[in-house]
Amino acid sequence: MNIDAISIGSNPPEDVNVIIEVPVGGQPIKYEMDKKAGALIVDRFLYTPMTYPGNYGFVPHTLSEDGDPIDVLVCNTRPLIPGCVINVRPIGVLVMEDNSGKDEKIIAVPSPHLTRRYEKIHDYTDMPEITLKQIAHFFEHYKDLEPGKWVKIGDWGDEDYARKFIVEAIERAKGK
């Protein structure tokens, strides 16, 4: 896969493309895309018997403060094949910190042209409360049994915060 050939999206930051690395509900394995080789690599086996609460991946041509492309959790119920690209609408951000520093997760839903299921979801606060609790619980505990690793959940950011975060990540990648 030539990641350079995949666009950020047709109208960033309102919609962005996400390259999926880990499917919702899959085995507790963390995959990461080798950005230069375009190959999906097994990063690690999760020590906790937990599954991702959404399809997880990154936005190409972005750079977060940790030096990686920005992470995205796509809130939908159908597992996507790792390596596929899905167009999404960002609705919020879960602000976290881990043993490596600040680590934000964009929360998004599939774009309306893919499914109408999420067309009335515009902000993370439109999601069911239990979904938000499950997302926070997963990220707070998925590294629990890994030696030397920890995660602290901070605040949630709204749709505007997510858009601002994406714009900054695009600019950071351009300046690299």
UniProtKB/Swiss-Prot annotation:
The record's listing under PROSITE patterns reads:
PPASE
> What keywords are assigned to this protein?
Cytoplasm, Hydrolase, Magnesium, Metal-binding
Q: Which GO terms describe its cellular component?
A: cytoplasm
Task: Give its localization.
Answer: Cytoplasm
Q: Which residues bind substrate?
A: 30, 44, 56, 142
Residues involved in Mg(2+) 1 binding = 66, 71, 103
Lineage, top-rank taxon, reads: Bacteria
Query: In terms of one coarse class, where is the protein primarily found?
Result: cytoplasm
Q: Which reaction does it catalyse?
A: diphosphate + H2O = 2 phosphate + H(+)
EC number(s) of the enzyme?
3.6.1.1
The record's note on quaternary structure and interaction partners says: Homohexamer.
**HAMAP family from the entry?**
Inorganic_PPase
Q: What is this protein called?
A: Inorganic pyrophosphatase
* Species whose genome carries this gene: Brucella melitensis biotype 1 (strain ATCC 23456 / CCUG 17765 / NCTC 10094 / 16M)
Gene (UniProt): ppa
